[in-house]
Amino acid sequence: MFGGQTIIPIDRMEPPFWVTDYSLQQRYFSIFHITSETTPGYVQALHKFAPSHLIGYPSILAVLAYHILELGLPAPALKVIICNSEQVLEHQRKLMVEAFKCPVIETYGMAEITAAASECTAGTLHTWPEAGILEVYHPEEAVYVNEKGIEGDFVMTGLLNPDMPLIRYRNGDRGSLPDWEARCECGRSLPRFGSIQGRTKDLILTADGRKLYILDSIFNGLPIVEAQLIQESLSSFVVKLVPLDHTGSSLAELDAK
């Protein structure tokens, strides 16, 4: 699994860059340490664990696939790669298929499970109606959209969590309503997902060519309200912070960091 969890210290410079949950037979790989130099270790760990499939962010798995192809490494035999959290771009799919020699399946979902969809063998995203009710809100007009093809903010009501139901929850994604009438050549009658714009993820590019994602982990544990990281060049960054208070304790802790 290649997700956004910080599973090992960010400043670790030597493998292992992964941890294993033997009770669930799952291995979690750090996405923050993937480089051309560390990729052989990742591939060796994958071969040793011998998974049937990979789950992770397509942007990360595409970088891993690129390095595998760049170095001419033999990838492990997989049945499928399941991508989540981001849309799968065509160049990412091509890289993963070429490197791992297996199908790539796109999914849509979130930890709150207020909506979900998965890609069928025909390449169509089908929604899972049992996960929740998906609506589209047009913020400029301040109305809910009832027509197919009109994009707006996703508004979701989850149906799977009776303990903490989320009602008309806006998760920040945008797109259009599912199509309940269209039929897919795969034979499934589940509605076809409308367009998904999704959210974009920021990254920084280092001087040695690495791409670093999930930048919010940099600010974990700091006494701040919000933060902004601006990259001006490969070696120059501007960090803007709003402390919890301006009286002394928060400022002193930030100065110490």
Segments predicted by a language model, with ranges:
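Active-site glycine/GP-rich loop and adjacent strand/helix microenvironment
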Residues: 21-257
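Conserved AMP-binding loop of ANL adenylate-forming enzymes
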Residues: 1-20, 29-33
